């Protein structure tokens, strides 16, 4: 089961030299993670553009879908998996 978060909260992400997430900090918790999958989404360039790098990550406590908003330069949490 997964939980899609209504608001996509901003999170802190530490990355390796290639830009892969290695640690996620959310709600004061620091979680080392490994990348399972990643993909890029670019849509609606003619109105409110979306340019995101999505990354599915797994940690010791959870599996999550996070993304880097390439327009704003901020990381967000979109979904948590049980």
Where are these regions (language model features)?
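Non-catalytic peripheral regions of nucleotide-handling enzymes
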Residues: 1-82
